Amino acid sequence: KHQGFKQMITLEQAWQAVHLVPDPEIPVISVTDLGIVREIQIKGEVVHIALTPTYSGCPATQEIQRDVEKALLSAGASSVEMELRLSPAWTTDWINPEAKEKLKRYGMATPSKCASPAAEQVIRFVPTLKENLNCPLCNSNKTERISEFGSTACKALYRCLSCREPFEFFKPI
């Protein structure tokens, strides 16, 4: 819990402030685009925010918490309480459609649907895909996986056989 100057902030202002916080590992999308901001409530002078990390060991979680808190305090919150919600587990289905388009323009492929139904599930970082991935650069479906892990555990590295460019794939979780 962080205490700051006593100012009032509306729920709409809180959501707007948090929407401006970029994901530290994929800065072209915000933490709200990614779907990890699960809830914001204002109770008195305290902004309560619930975040669900992309996975429980995500190394960016603390940085995201700091950035979200800073954004809320800058927007006029006088106090912020953060909750990490690990259940239900985050799924790539929570990435909003606009963010998927931003990721494609950034050169990253996203799954069309979750690997398994949203419920209690085992998170697997090795993709078991039954679909051909389209290259986010040229849209060819002639692609191959180079590595099961990309720059982070939740991404895999692929290469397009048509344009020969490498790209990352956000694994279905």
What are these regions (language model features)?
Residues G4-I173:
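Domain-level signature for proteins that mediate thiol-based redox and metal-cofactor handling
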